[in-house]
UniProtKB/Swiss-Prot annotation:
Cellular localisation: Mitochondrion inner membrane
Binding-site residues for heme b b562, renumbered to this chain: H84, H183
UniProt-annotated binding residues for a ubiquinone: H202
UniProt cross-references to SUPFAM superfamilies, sorted A to Z: a domain/subunit of cytochrome bc1 complex (Ubiquinol-cytochrome c reductase), Transmembrane di-heme cytochromes
Protein name: Cytochrome b
Amino acid sequence: MAIFIRKMHPLLKIMNHALVDLPAPSNISLWWNFGSLLGLCLIIQILTGLFLAMHYTADVSMAFSSVVHICRDVNYGWLIRNIHANGASLFFICVYLHIARGLYYGSYLYKETWNIGVILLFLLMATAFVGYVLPWGQMSFWGATVITNLLSAFPYIGNMLVQWIWGGFSVDNATLTRFFAFHFLLPFLILALTVIHLLFLHETGSNNPLGINSDADKISFHPYFSYKDLLGFFVMIFFLTTLALFMPNLLGDAENFIPANPLVTPPHIKPEWYFLFAYAILRSIPNKLGGVLALLFSIFILMLVPLLHTSKQRSNIFRPLTQIFFWLLVANSIILTWIGGQPVEQPFITVGQIASISYFSLFLIIMPFASWCENKILSLN
């Protein structure tokens, strides 16, 4: 009877097609676990965020104190806050690995799924940015001031745009209140887009490591991949709890333990680690507007990847030349992340500029050209 309910009930039928009887390629590897891990991350962040919002006060005179109150006086408030703060880092680790897998195995050729994924990344970054402002520490305040000020680079409307976002002539109470509203709202928008992301994915079915049609060799999602995902859940929760309980401030900034002071600028303003690669690209261009456009393009360049696919093969698994350049891109992104956390002085400026040029060159010129060369080598036989 249970089988019939699962397959006949209008609501359960949708769940069944998405989670139980979903046909999945039999050879998908560990790299296909990150989609479900991102779903788990999103649920953890929404739940912990909801409990934090119950005790947080979005007011410049009380925001910092309310976070201290959560950590000291609320039952397990310190744990909820540590899980929420470190959960964001884990979220971005999973996102970057998910994107890397998509780039390596050619999953970007499912254009609708991929483009919605890029929009999801942009929304996730926006959510993390406005969330980082909420504790109202020094780095929160100055990070908000510096990043929002970048919008003034746009001609004609720039200054008006900045003041409109600030709700005044500086980052103040109006800014904090609206950032809290955005931080509360955006995760639910991410949740809605995630459903659309999955709808498009289930239209085409999952890609696989070989990058070939796997219709002849599909197995049901449950129990095979549901248990495989469950292992990933346990591993991720282990890492998250280890980070939250033993090293909760490892990925944070010490400056944020100081209440926001508009009269004292921190010696080195930098965002959270997961934005450092884009921040390094922003800083590597001397022109303000050019830097802002490069910052945006560093993320939206992912939308061009399907258009720049010149190879006759989908996956990188049998393409040694493209593999080399893919791993160079990974190394380059790590170098950019390191540079973004360093002060603006030599040799970091030059290294950042070289890494930024390499980042865009690999996407726009080198990898498409490598694919074209591989096609030529294949046609020799």
